[in-house]
Amino acid sequence: MAYTVKFQTESKYKSISYGSNSIYNSACGPASLCNALKALGLADVSIPTMCQLAVSCGARVDGGTVMATLLKAAAPKYHFCYRTTSKNAELLAHLKAGGVAILHGGSSHKLFSNSGHFVCAVRASGETITVLDSYWYAGKYTSTKLRRQKVKVLAKGVITTSLYQCGLATADRAPSYYLISKAIQKPQKPASSNTTTDKKQEDDDMTYYKKFENIPTWYQTAVKKAIDAGALNGTGNGELNVSEDLCRTLTVLDKMGTLDKK
């Protein structure tokens, strides 16, 4: 099957800003969602348009995109539903059922990138996963031994790799996978008054970092100050498990000077 891939690495995007950087350098989040919507047959959205939505809804942060925030804003607009998981079996079942997924690649297993990167999985055949990569350049998947051995390039922006490799590449991100499907139209129901259910959905949509080294570098200074001050102690089992929202809040407080010792 042929796929249409939208690339953030078109030369024209070097001069178009996305927050404090350019679309070319930092719009893998919006671009991966554009590719997901196109693959599902829901919408043909340009990368700049999706970037504008990311900025307007607060998903754009220094150094990256908060995918949960972007999906929450985009879902009603483009008529899709989504959920999160870090389980390979759930990703595989979702793809085989006709859904697509955004994979959040990390920095510990540099399959899709040398640092954090979003890509879009569109198909599973057995345990072979077809992935669309918006950050494309010549020789990307022959540049390292890992990529040469574990990735097959089908066309520009279209690769296959194993389910196992997808798991390794996303192991230091929580959630690893954002599973996206066409929305099913249901009768309107009264607004939920079940705060427990609402809170569970909110928690499921949140991104968590298990260890300090998993936290994006632009948050690390502020989080380190909170740890040193004894304000963050983790889960007690060796994991920090800090949410992206808390990282953002601490970073804002640090820029205000609130975290500096008096």
Annotated model-derived regions:
Residues L40-S46, I129, D260-K262:
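Structural helix-adjacent loops and short alpha-helical linkers that scaffold large soluble proteins
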Residues Y24, G29-L33, S46, G63-L70, ...:
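Stable alpha-helical elements in mature extracytoplasmic
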Residues A2, A124-N194:
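Noncatalytic regulatory segments and standalone regulatory/sensor domains
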Residues M1-A59, K145-K152, P216, V223, ...:
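Active-site-adjacent structural segments surrounding the nucleophilic cysteine of cysteine proteases
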Residues T84-K140:
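Active-site-adjacent substructure of cysteine-protease-like catalytic cores
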Residues K14-Y24, V119, G236-V242:
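Short, polar loop/linker segments at the starts of domains and inter-domain junctions
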Residues G29-C34, T195-K262:
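Short, solvent-exposed alpha-helical surface patches in non-cytosolic proteins
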Residues A43-E90:
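Catalytic cysteine-centered active-site loop
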